[in-house]
Amino acid sequence: MVKAKKQYGQNFLIDKSVLAKIIQAIPKEMNNIIEIGPGLGDLTQELLKISQVKAYEIDNDLIPILKKKFQKELECGKFNLIHQDASEAFNPSLDEKPYFLVANLPYYVASHIILKALEDKNCLGLIVMAQREMAEKFCAKEGNSEFSSLGVLSAMICERKILFDVDPQCFNPPPKVMSAVMSLIKTKDFDELCEIENFKNFLKDCFKAPRKQLLGNLKTYKAKVLEVLSTLGLKENIRPHEICVDLYLKIYDKLKDEYGRKQRDK
């Protein structure tokens, strides 16, 4: 039995019923799937029944195991195994063709990889397993205390849903937290709405103290923020988690020149 490595945040999924539910949730028309962290290949095996698969694996010790297990699929070109850290492979895309991402993500890189995938124009959407708390942040709605910059970014371009929870006992070794599988299906790209790097910097400021008032977090631009809040009919003491995506875009529109200048001056 291969031992999971802590430095890669490995927890091997061993519950076959969870694998089946993940496969069932993948949109039927997806025929080019990318998997991050195939591990021992249990999910990969099921994915190959419905699509060609390109998998990114960082662990040296798992590469020969996967090559042996999927020798036929590798030889016929249905499976492509890349020995690389996937978080460094967005260059700018994980694949030259449109793809759908499926992954059991290590908790320590989950948010980074999901955001990279959302920014990747070739990514059509993703079904990923992550820490339940992380899934809640990506799928939260305005008004919910969990609504954060991650929720704003995903809501801008995706249909979002937490599909189901996954108990620690479904893994070897069992993690110390509850996991969840979420679906993020893209409906548009960021560049249809804004300049994403500047907008992310804006959101970082908006949520730097999430329980404080938005006006306090954006005090550098207090006069402009007061003006736009008044124009939009929003109260001055509104907090970041109470504002919907459309309103964030409208507030940003009044401040985008400031954030563009900030980026250029870096």
From Swiss-Prot:
Gene3D superfamilies: Ribosomal RNA adenine dimethylase-like, domain 2, Vaccinia Virus protein VP39
GO MF terms held by the record: 16S rRNA (adenine(1518)-N(6)/adenine(1519)-N(6))-dimethyltransferase activity; RNA binding
Catalytic activity from the UniProt record: adenosine(1518)/adenosine(1519) in 16S rRNA + 4 S-adenosyl-L-methionine = N(6)-dimethyladenosine(1518)/N(6)-dimethyladenosine(1519) in 16S rRNA + 4 S-adenosyl-L-homocysteine + 4 H(+)
UniProt entry keywords in alphabetical sequence: Cytoplasm, Methyltransferase, RNA-binding, rRNA processing, S-adenosyl-L-methionine, Transferase
InterPro entries: KsgA/Erm, rRNA_Ade_diMease-like_C, rRNA_Ade_Mease_Trfase_CS, rRNA_Ade_methylase_Trfase_N, rRNA_adenine_dimethylase, SAM-dependent_MTases_sf
Intracellular or extracellular location(s): Cytoplasm
Top-level taxon: Bacteria
Record-stated family: Belongs to the class I-like SAM-binding methyltransferase superfamily. rRNA adenine N(6)-methyltransferase family. RsmA subfamily.
Name of this protein: Ribosomal RNA small subunit methyltransferase A
Organism: Campylobacter jejuni subsp. jejuni serotype O:2 (strain ATCC 700819 / NCTC 11168)
